[in-house]
Structures are given as C-alpha cells and as structure tokens.
UniProtKB/Swiss-Prot annotation:
Belongs to the ARB2A family. Residues 229-242 have a biased composition (Basic and acidic residues). GO terms for biological process: mRNA processing; RNA splicing. May play role in the regulation of alternative splicing. May have hydrolase activity. PANTHER family: COTRANSCRIPTIONAL REGULATOR FAM172A, FAM172 FAMILY PROTEIN HOMOLOG CG10038. Residues 213-253, 403-422 are annotated as: Disordered. It is found in: Nucleus; Cytoplasm. Residues 1-19 form the signal peptide. InterPro entries: AB_hydrolase_fold, Arb2, Arb2_dom. One of its GO terms (cellular component) is nucleus. This is Cotranscriptional regulator ARB2A homolog. Its main location: nucleus.
Length: 422
C-alpha cells in the first residue's frame, strides 16, 4: 500500500502541482504568488530522493555468477553459494520491474556461461558470421565441432526456439530454475559427438547489436524552437535555471531510471532466424562432407527449418536424413510448403509435442505434414529434454533405414528407452 501511495504522489499529484504553479505564475496577482510560494515550500518538505530510493534500487547488477552469489553444483543446478537454495525471483517484494531486470541480468550471465561450456567442456569452436565480415561491422557466430566440415558420415544440427535463448540453450528458465541438462543443448552435443556425429549449433536469435543513440548537445535548440511563441521563449530565457530544474524534476520522477535509448544494427545476412539458418546452410552445412545431416529443431526452430526447406528443397532432401522437431510451431499451410515437401516431411520428420500422453504415444494432427508423438510432458520448454532418448533412437532408425533403403519410422512406446535411465 505504501508503494502505491508513493507511486500515486510521484506520477499523478506532483505533475498537477507543477501545472497549477505554472498557471498561478502566469496570472501574476500578489495573493496568487503567495500560493505559489506556499506550494514550493510544501514541495521542499518532500524528500523525493529518499522516496525514490525506497521505491526502486538502482538497476545495477553484478556481471558474474559469483557476484550474484550463485554457482552451478555437480548436478548442474544453480544454487546460492551460502545457503544452497535455488534462485529466488522475488528478491525484493513489491518491486517487480527491479526483480525482472535482475533476472534478465542473470540470464545474460547464463548465456555467457553456456558459451564457455560449449567451447571448454564440449570442445566446440566459435565461428563468426558473416564469414567475410569487416572489422567494423556487427557479427554473429555459431559453434561447430572440429570435424564439422570433414566428417564423412553424419552431422547433427541444433536449432533452438525464439526469444532470449542463444546458442547452446533450449530454455533459459530451465537452466536457472532446474538444471543445465534440461535447459541446455549440451546433452545432445555430448551424446552426438560420442556417437561419431559432427555438430553445428545455430544461433538464430543473434540478429543485431544495440548501440546507444547519440545524445543531443545541451546547448542545441529543440527542433520546434522556431515555432515557440516569443512571449513564452522570453519567459523561458529569463529564468533558464528554474525551467531546467522543473523539467529535470518531472523527468526524474516520471521515469526515475530511464533506460538508455538504443538503435538496433542488424547483422548482414543474419537479420532473422530464417536468414541465419539459410546463411549457415549455404556456407557450412551444404558444403560439409557428411553424407547424412540430422536436425533437432525446437519450437520456432521448427518453423525456421521448414522455411529452409522451402528455400532449398532439393538440396535439403538430398543431404538431410531425418528431422526431430520438439513442439514445433511450423505450419505448412501458412508457410506455403509444396506437396512434395509435405510428403518428404511425412517420411523423414517426427514432431515430439507437449502432451499428457505417455512418451512416444501417437498424437493426432490436423496438418498433413509429419507424425506427431507425445514428448511425455505438458511443458513446452521441456519437450526437447524429455524426448532426448527417443530422438536418438529415431535417428538410429532413420540411418539404418536409409542404408537398407527402407522407410524410417518414429519410435513407439514398445521400443523406447526410458527417460529415467539417463
């Protein structure tokens, strides 16, 4: 309740007070000037700086896990260093914006931590895009195993969904609240490399960099100053300090921690997930030596893969052996997928969807594309993890079927490996 009262005073009452003061000053009568003096005295008694400190602390957060007093334990769980407790979102009560900014700051650290694990733990190499980028232009990057271009047998390509996730992640929320295994792509990478796959990890959400807008010099006139009435301009120029003080006061308490205004500078040929996937296909995957390419694509990553197929249908059909989708949001009608493409998907793709049904149970679909089976969970973000074993079994069946010239079939409950065995 106290917080609501403070916000009401700052956002509603004070602007009205300043407006009334301005109107009173324009009238100019002695008694009105006395009212102005009284109002100023009233405002001077309100310790607004202290009020705002209580409302919201500075949006300044540590840039390391240690700074947050968190670390990953031997089970890959994020825990408080002193207490061993899981991450707490509502660190400060009644300060949702501050808590959200704190969570986002931690999320950025998690992203960097996963990048480090991809390079150090999985021994992947970071490759910058575009391949011919100059030193002055923005760049993205992907991760590749050392044999990505030379492995003659098979390659696994991973595509995550949309949002804040980056290369190596399925769901940031899972990494923070549950563990690295369920939320990251690391289990897929390690198992694939152990089984002789080359690996490429796409980074489809790294589409631009943000640069701060250049600030207008303080002495530069505003664009519409020439249209300002002469009387108003003279009054403003007579008392510039008071005008600036009033403007700064209002701006500060209307938006006490105004975030920096930024411009988005898009990365050449990688300005969207679809562009990114097409670029990586043209410059890496299609040129790789692997005879069999296999994809795992989660959520929007499934839509991204279907768009890649639409753009490079013949090439994809020639090189891709199987595609595992996890709760994909693709739509073959909206994306104008051809009949031949839909037929290929029915034979070579399987979509593990969120469902209350047991793992690998067939789920009805209204779209004429690929088989749908249950991922064994109703949580969208968990579908890639819960279907982990089933997907590799599906890949094994697909590769064996290709070698024996028979059609691959999705895993069924009767022959699945239990997830709990992982």
């Amino acid at each position: 309740m106290k917080l609501e009262i403070k916000c009401f005073i700052i956002c509603k009452v004070l602007p009205l007070v300043w407006l009334n003061m301005a109107q009173i000053q324009q009238v100019g009568a002695p008694e009105e000037k006395e009212k102005t003096t009284a109002l100023k005295d009233l405002l001077s008694r309100i310790d607004l700086d202290e009020l705002m400190k209580k409302d919201e602390p500075p949006l300044e957060f540590p840039d390391t896990l240690e700074g947050f007093n968190y670390a990953f334990n031997e089970l890959g769980q994020l825990r408080h260093i002193q207490t061993g407790d899981p991450f707490v979102f509502n660190y400060r009560e009644d300060l949702h914006r501050w808590n959200q900014k704190r969570y986002e700051a931690l999320g950025e650290i998690i992203t960097k931590h996963v990048y480090e694990l991809l390079e150090k733990d999985c021994e992947l190499e970071k490759v910058y895009l575009p391949v011919d980028a100059t030193d002055s232009e923005p760049r993205s990057f992907i991760f590749m195993s050392k044999d990505a271009m030379t492995n003659p047998d098979k390659m696994l390509v991973l595509i995550h969904g949309s949002g804040v996730v980056r290369a190596g992640q399925w769901a940031r929320r899972l990494i923070i609240n549950e563990d690295l295994n369920s939320g990251s792509q690391i289990p897929y990478i390690k198992r694939a490399m152990k089984e002789g796959y080359a690996v490429i990890v796409l980074n489809p959400n790294e589409n631009y960099i943000e640069v701060e807008k250049s600030k207008v010099p303080a002495d530069q006139p505003s664009p519409d100053s020439s249209d300002e009435p002469a009387e108003k301009r003279e009054r403003r120029e007579r008392n510039p300090k008071e005008t600036k003080k009033r403007r700064d006061f209002y701006e500060k308490y209307r938006n006490p921690q105004k975030e920096k205004e930024t411009l988005q500078v898009y990365i050449r040929d990688n300005g969207s997930p679809e562009e990114h996937a097409l670029y990586v296909w043209d410059n890496f995957i299609s040129k790789a030596a692997a005879e069999n390419i296999l994809f795992v694509a989660h959520s929007y990553g499934g839509l991204t893969f279907v768009e890649l197929m639409i753009q490079r249908e013949a090439d994809v059909k020639n090189k891709v052996a199987a595609v595992a989708l996890t709760d994909s949001v693709h739509n073959v009608w909206h994306q104008d997928a051809s009949k031949t493409l839909r037929e290929w998907m029915r034979e070579n793709c399987c979509n593990w969807v969120s469902s209350s049904e047991p793992l690998d149970t067939s789920v009805e679909s209204t779209l004429p594309d690929c088989p749908r089976v249950s991922a064994g969970t109703e949580r969208h973000e968990l579908t890639s993890w819960k279907s982990f074993h089933s997907i590799f079994k599906f890949f094994d069946d697909a590769l064996q079927a290709k070698n024996t010239k028979t059609k691959p079939t999705p895993t069924r409950r009767s022959n699945r490996i239990k997830h709990e065995d992982l």
